[in-house]
């Protein structure tokens, strides 16, 4: 089993591996790099992987859901009618209505001819069966900067507010912001950078403990809402988590230790 504890010794919980879950994949399927995991209201586990990252995985659907018994319940993904599919998947989220959100971004794609910053500049919304519902961003266009209200820049993560159906996107590999859209219509709502300020795409100083905290995000890599009504953003390049009200008002921040040592969280 596995037991996790924080640096103060408080135990987070005990976990044991179930070697029989999930069941073996169908014949001919092979997973590439898994870049996202989510759960839905039925306790199905969803994953998204990169078929183009592993030789022999090209025919495996990028999105796969397993039921509680580990059997494949859904599988789909790739280009389709009415939407565009990027070259580098990055992240998956299942909202309060069990709609599935898929992101694209994250470094250079496996295909060296693809344009990493423009091909992977969108977020897609589907039903659990893979029916296309909504596209935010565009393919082959890319960002117009962190103040663009239309285009994304290699988004990294998605969270949907069940109360408003607004979708919060950490737009972080090329841009430096959190951007919010109407999750039903795709209309732009608002965006912000570090400390709730307007984002700045200028040079980012290298993070150091000896300097003042950076005023801007540096690769915001996750966004999530909590039961306290606040929004938490992982600012990976600056080794911190920033906390906001839903309108982007800054609340607090916490820095991650530079060296966590052995097995600490």
PLM features per residue range, with description:
Residues 2-265:
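Eukaryotic scaffold repeat domains enriched in small/polar residues
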